[in-house]
Amino acid sequence: LALQPIDQDTIAIAHRLTAVPHFNWPTGMDLTPDGLSAVVLTYNNGYLFKRRQNEDWPNAFKRKPQRLRFDRLFQQEAVSFGFYGKSVFVTSERIPAPLVRIDLEESDKKP
């Protein structure tokens, strides 16, 4: 869909661009403020995709992502990057719904 505002009388039509082969049942997704990284959340894990220079999203989503584990949560439902795109916030649908922060720079250092 277009990222710029459209006239309210205009019908926006979404088109499937590609299938993402790495997981099933996505529950949330967010893009970094610079538009170069995406995080996709499932009930069990998060997946971080980083675009290469001049790469489109369909091709970026075909590459193997970095897996992010959120062991303390059950049925993760919502995900968001922090303001600068250096951390990810995740919460679950179970009450009480804790908010977990993952520092992406630290997760890059883990084996």
State where each predicted segment sits.
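Sequence/structural signature of beta-propeller domains
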Residues: L1-P111
